Amino acid sequence: MKKLVMLLALVALTSLGATAGADNKTKVKWFGHAAFEIDLPSGKTILIDPWITNPTNPTGKDDVKTVKADLILITHGHFDHIGDATDIAKRTKAHLVATFDLGNAIVAGGYPKDQYGFDTGGNFGGSLDVLGGEATISFVPAIHSSAIGTDPAKAGYGGNPGGFVIVVKGGPTIYHTGDTDLFGDMALIGSHWKVDLMLSCIGDHFTMGPDRAAEAVKLVKAKQVVPMHFGTFPVLTGTPDEFGKALKKTAPSAKLTVMKVGDTITL
């Protein structure tokens, strides 16, 4: 009887350990366009470029009311990247992470001013330890533009466009390119960090298209890549199929993961 009790206890402990290990994962959800949610093992949540109500997301109007956020990261000032940030921030109390000038401009546009400051504002070359040390966020450049507002007569200064490298403690390293063209210094990102997941724009017209995005993956040496910023508008003509073909030629070792809007992957 004693042996049976010990055996059952061992099985229970093994089961609990397996469950804890399964939960100790980072999850990434795509809301369409450039909007991603990163769920950390602790339960904390990072949103990037949260245009949750973008036209590719059929549940956007509901999602924007329920999405969680502890931090909101914005790559640049265009409307399709600031998106629903202010409304989400007012509901969740999420702090804003952005380059300093961009952050100030977003606050001037209505983002709660007590949810942004020197602790979450930075600039290229800088890194922030966030969420009690569970993650480090680094600011990296992008080649794009960053005006705030679509009316040329009223467009405001939005700082410089950029991307983010997010290193989860004991977990994956994720690079969100923001909107950008291919540029040579992407190789420095690949040499400084071991990028597990690259979230890469591929839509062409306003950013690099599939061929140049594949070159970017090669420079970054990303293990896995998820295409984004395509198909939202007719002019964003780059497709995941074209990107996949280019990857096979240019960066064949990279794993291509094509997400559907609303999909979640576990790292």
Positions of PLM-derived features:
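Binuclear metal-ion centers of metallo-dependent hydrolases, dominated by the metallo-beta-lactamase
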Residues: V107-L131, A214, K218-L267
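Zn-dependent metallo-beta-lactamase
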Residues: K2-T45, I52-N54, S138-I143, V261-D263
